[in-house]
């Protein structure tokens, strides 16, 4: 069997004894977090190591040099970013080029039917001129695109848990629920479940390398993986109907 092993660093230790260098992208934290990840997973190296957020308190050169030190030490093969802006990614590549070092190979952005701007607009110049992979997260919009929140928040669901108030405020907007209902009807018409349609829509984008799938049951994962088989059915007509329902297609950047 073959797999790609990744880890990420930024938020670090959350306890009351949290120290300044136990979070962020300082050289100290990136090096220590990588070492600890290797120990936890009992491996010699990571295929991919993410800077989980940008860090305004650390110079970009320090981040680039640290990630390349880890590459040279054989602890990671590639490094990436997560939730970085297009400008921050370009800056990292410019710094890396000036130093003769490796820039980030992949970005991990949120991407789904309700969150399209980064993949479909902001990053287009990067995809064209630099070339960069993406590992998207939340293809089901925190479960909204499963349809399970159409009639409220079920007990035991993620949005019902303490500490997820921010997600409820972000995800449950009446207009979105109306669109989810319409998308569900389209999925029924196409003979698939809404999560399958939603994930297939994401991975159809040629700039999406892979998608992070979350599931609480094995059956949910098995169902969602049917998106790969369904992908050929996402023709131009179906994609146009989805865009018509969503009404949020990003404007392409002008050059």
Predicted regions and their residues:
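N-terminal binding-site loop/beta-alpha segment at the start of enzyme catalytic domains
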Residues: 1-4, 44, 72
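Beta/alpha (TIM)-barrel catalytic core signal, keyed to glycine-rich beta->alpha loops juxtaposed to Asp/Glu
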Residues: 60-246
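Active-site groove signature of glycoside hydrolases
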Residues: 38-59
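A short, structured active-site edge motif that brings together acidic residues
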Residues: 1-14, 107-111
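Active-site mouth loops of central-metabolism enzymes
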Residues: 16-31, 52-58
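N-terminal small/glycine-rich loop or linker at the start of catalytic domains
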Residues: 6-21, 45-50
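Short amphipathic alpha-helices and their capping/turn segments at secondary-structure boundaries
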Residues: 1, 33-39, 123-131
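Short, acidic/polar
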Residues: 24-41, 89-94
């Amino acid at each position: 069997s073959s797999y790609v092993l990744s880890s990420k660093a930024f938020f670090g230790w959350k306890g009351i004894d949290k120290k300044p260098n136990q979070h962020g992208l300082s050289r100290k934290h990136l090096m220590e977090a990588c070492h600890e990840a290797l120990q936890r997973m009992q491996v010699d190296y990571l295929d991919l190591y993410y800077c989980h957020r940008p860090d305004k308190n650390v110079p970009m050169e320090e981040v680039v040099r640290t990630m390349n030190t880890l590459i040279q030490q054989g602890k990671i093969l590639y490094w990436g970013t997560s939730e970085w802006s297009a400008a921050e990614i370009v800056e990292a590549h410019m710094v890396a080029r000036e130093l003769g070092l490796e820039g980030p190979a992949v970005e991990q952005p949120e991407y789904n039917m309700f969150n399209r701007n980064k993949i479909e607009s902001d990053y287009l110049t990067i995809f064209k001129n630099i070339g960069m992979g993406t590992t998207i997260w939340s293809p089901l919009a925190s479960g909204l695109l499963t349809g399970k929140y159409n009639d409220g928040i079920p007990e035991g669901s993620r949005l019902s848990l303490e500490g997820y108030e921010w997600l409820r405020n972000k995800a449950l907007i009446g207009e979105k629920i109306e669109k989810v209902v319409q998308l569900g009807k389209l999925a029924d018409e196409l003979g698939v479940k809404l999560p399958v349609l939603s994930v297939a829509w994401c991975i159809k984008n040629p700039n999406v390398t892979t998608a992070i799938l979350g599931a609480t049951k094995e059956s949910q994962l098995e169902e969602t993986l049917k998106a790969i088989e369904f992908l050929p059915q996402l023709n131009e007509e179906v994609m146009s109907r989805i865009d018509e329902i969503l009404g949020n297609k990003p404007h392409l950047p002008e050059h």
